[in-house]
Each structure stands twice: as C-alpha cells, then as structure tokens.
Amino acid sequence: MIFAVSLSLFACGKVDGDGKENTTGNTPTVDKTEDTTAEVTTAAGMKKGDEGNGPADINAEFITLKLPSGYKYEVDSFSKDSKNPLKGNVTLFIYKDGSYSSIATLTATARNMVRSQEEAVENTIKLCNLQTYKNGKSEIGKDAKYGENTYSTIHVSTDYYEKDFFVTYANRGTSDTTGLLVKLEINNKNIKADDPFIKELLDSLKIVMA
C-alpha cells in the first residue's frame, strides 16, 4: 500500500520581511514546523500488516474514517468478494503512539449475514460468549449517536477483562442483501468508553453506500 503523505519534521532558516534568510550571529535561528497534512490511505492493495500514523484519512472500502494525531493503525485483515463488491470485511487495530498494545479493534464486515441492528447486537454477544472464559456477562446499554450512525452499546465483563462495544448496521442499497456490520471493540484496561478519542473516531466514521 502506498501512503501519499507522511508526517515529517523539518528545519528551515528564519526569514526576514524582505524574503531573505536571516544569518545574523554565529548560529541561525531555526524554526521546527510540523506538517499536519493527513496521510491518505486507500483500499487499493490493502493487506494484512499495512500500517500508518495519524493524522490519517483512511478509506477501507466499506468504511472511511479519520485517525487523529497521536495514534496509529494496523490492518489485521482485509478481503473483498471479487463477484460481489458489497461483500467482504476489514479489521483495523488502533494503537496509541509508543504503545505495543492495541486500544481498540475496528471491524466492518458483510459476511455475518445479519439483517438488522438487533441481529448485529445478538451476533456480537454470541461471538463474545464463544470467546470468553467463565462467568462472562454482557449488558446492553443505551444507544449512542456519533456522526451519521447510531450505535448500540454493549459492556462485556469476565473474570479476566472488561470490554465495551459500539455496534451499528446498515443496508447499503437495494442490491445489498447482506448488510454491513460495523463494530468498535475497546479494552477497558487501555482506554475507557467515554474517552474523547472514541467520540472523535466514531464521529468521523462513514459507511460507504452502494
């Protein structure tokens, strides 16, 4: 995958009002300016292991989103049905800069065969039950509106961890017989559900319609 623009730090000589570089004194004054232009990531050629740093505009085929500065992402999986472009899935791991442990997992999939928001929630809980150890408990909370989407919230607790899920579902057109399930999973050990980053991320997330 090709990243169009990378973050960079560059040094330049201080410029006077006449446009000439100021060389007064033995050591020129140095300004360090951060280029905050966002990376642009497209779905073309996306594959497992691809990664990038925020700020980034990410086009992951089925969804688009903006990752703010101070965070990075890694593609865990990406696939697209060659016969039906509406079918496929993408999973992204999200990290804080300098951390080796992901704070969130974002998944968009059209392979679960769910046909409603209610089924999307049931599917998420079912997968949690399969993956949890003993004494797992799932609680459905209040719906939350972020950006263009309304998310069902699920809190999962076990003897070993606590997680929160934000789940939404969309039909993307008359030819879409599967629907798209979008799920953000966060581990409470690394980040909380009310962290401003979660709102910023979900506010930016858009589902690509057919």
Stretches with model-predicted labels:
Residues 1-10:
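Sec-dependent bacterial lipoprotein signal peptides
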Residues 10-32:
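Bacterial lipoprotein signal-peptidase II cleavage site
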Residues 25-69:
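N-terminal low-complexity, Pro/Thr/Ser-rich intrinsically disordered segments
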Residues 50-57, 86-91, 145-155:
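Short, hydrophobic/aromatic-rich segments at coil-to-beta transitions
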Residues 61-118:
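Secretory pathway targeting signatures of secreted, lumenal, and periplasmic proteins
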Residues 67, 117-124, 194-201:
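Stable alpha-helical elements in mature extracytoplasmic
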Residues 71, 178-210:
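Surface-exposed amphipathic alpha-helical segments
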Residues 123-173:
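Signature of long, low-cysteine stretches enriched in small and polar/charged residues
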